[in-house]
């Protein structure tokens, strides 16, 4: 095994892969703690509001993980021998399944499938819907394989592979440009501008337009549309929130038109909103749920509407599958992480700390003309900046001051901290934002 000095790491990355855009630091895997990331080269500490793009539930080196010898032994077992979970049963995976069902799996979504990667979770949710819709059509006497289109929203991000390329359409066109895509129905995303009370009429108007577009597509493609998919809260597209009334209207349309409703909670799921799933706060249960990131291993949950056809993909062996069936190391890690989440009541912490973060962001919008539309559920918070260039400069200045925050949408800042973050750490990060704002007082908004 090659041992490199920290100073050599960026050179090796640059020599072997395209490292453009990576943070100018080398993460110290051992010294970093919680939401404090340590640069192995400089020794500088960074306050982490990035959370490895919303995938870190506990932050770095949580003591209940690092000091748990039994958990470490299980991790070592899984790391030394990479098992094909789809074919071999292990006590390690069984333990994870029990914990996942207890903590994360609603009785409303009894079927589960696991795979590595959020995009592949979405892909398999779509495959489940295609199979279901085609079987529905065959039962109606439609002899051809019809029912393989997906209704989706503008400013969606569902991944960068296969089917998902036809759905992803955020502000960065290079994520999908020149790759082949399907011509699937896309409707307006009637995102809320906050405070909602001041923008309700506009939001309701956009909802009406979106629903009319959806109805029009169902009128001309009813037998073709297998599902409606949306992120319960759009992440990459701009941290866009939707009213429960709109989600319920989509649910009603799906029921009326023999289509399944899929929620993509790869980014907004697993506790960041203050409940394990964001949909639990909104009163609308999906038929299929794609998950990942903080759950460590990704996958799909499914509800009873799948049972309207025989031999759907969750009961017929081999219809959806992969060699690794997820990743056993991720499952073993997730098993203990979910237990720690319960022990430390981190859903409650995400809700209360998120409320504090949102209060600080609302105060920021009142203090500076460069900020508006503060929004959030739990710790999944964001705020708009008056221009993209200003947003990008602001993020760069924050990094220089030791705070890592990331952007989304056209000109928004998003916050994705670990669920363990404290009030003091939130204040420290927002105080840095407040300090760098005056530097931009003469910039073009």
Predicted features along the sequence, with ranges:
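Conserved N-terminal phosphate-binding loop of PLP-dependent enzymes in the Aspartate aminotransferase
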Residues: 1-445
């Amino acid at each position: 095994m090659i041992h490199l000095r920290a100073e050599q790491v960026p050179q090796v990355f640059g020599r072997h892969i395209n490292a453009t855009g990576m943070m100018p630091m080398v993460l110290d895997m051992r010294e970093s703690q919680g939401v404090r990331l340590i640069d192995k080269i400089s020794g500088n500490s960074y306050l982490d509001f990035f959370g490895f793009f919303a995938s870190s539930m506990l932050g770095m080196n949580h003591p209940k993980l690092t000091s748990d010898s039994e958990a470490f032994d299980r991790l070592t077992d899984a790391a030394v021998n990479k098992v094909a979970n789809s074919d071999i049963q292990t006590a390690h995976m069984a333990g994870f399944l029990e914990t996942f069902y207890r903590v994360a799996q609603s009785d409303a979504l009894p079927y589960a499938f696991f795979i590595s990667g959020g995009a592949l979770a979405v892909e398999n949710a779509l495959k489940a819907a295609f199979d279901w819709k085609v079987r529905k059509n065959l039962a109606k006497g439609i002899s051809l394989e019809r029912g393989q289109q997906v209704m989706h929203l503008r400013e969606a991000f569902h991944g960068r592979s296969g089917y998902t390329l036809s759905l992803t359409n955020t502000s960065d066109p290079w994520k999908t440009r020149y790759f082949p895509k399907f011509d699937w129905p896309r409707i307006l995303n009637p995102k809320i501008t906050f405070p909602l009370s001041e923008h309700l009429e506009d939001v309701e108007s956009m909802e009406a337009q979106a629903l009319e577009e959806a109805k029009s597509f169902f009128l001309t493609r009813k037998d073709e549309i297998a599902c409606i998919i949306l992120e319960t809260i759009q992440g990459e597209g701009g941290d866009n929130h939707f009213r429960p009334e709109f989600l319920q209207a989509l649910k009603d349309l799906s029921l009326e038109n023999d289509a399944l409703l899929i929620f993509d909670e790869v980014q907004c799921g697993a506790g960041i909103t203050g409940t394990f799933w964001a949909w639990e706060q909104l009163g609308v249960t999906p038929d299929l749920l794609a998950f990942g990131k903080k759950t460590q291993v990704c996958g799909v949950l499914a509800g009873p509407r799948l049972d309207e056809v025989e031999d759907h993909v969750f009961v017929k062996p081999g219809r959806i599958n992969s060699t690794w069936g997820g990743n056993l190391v991720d499952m073993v890690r997730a098993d203990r992480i979910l237990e720690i989440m319960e022990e430390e009541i981190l859903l409650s912490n995400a809700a209360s700390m998120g409320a504090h973060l949102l209060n600080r962001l609302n105060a920021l919008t009142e203090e500076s003309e460069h900020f508006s539309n503060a929004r959030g559920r739990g710790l999944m918070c964001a705020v708009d900046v008056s221009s993209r260039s200003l947003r990008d400069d602001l993020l760069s200045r924050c990094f220089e001051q030791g705070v890592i925050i990331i952007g989304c949408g056209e000109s928004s800042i998003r916050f994705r901290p670990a669920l363990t973050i404290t009030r003091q750490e939130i204040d420290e990060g927002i105080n840095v934002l407040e300090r760098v704002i005056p530097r931009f007082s003469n910039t073009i908004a």
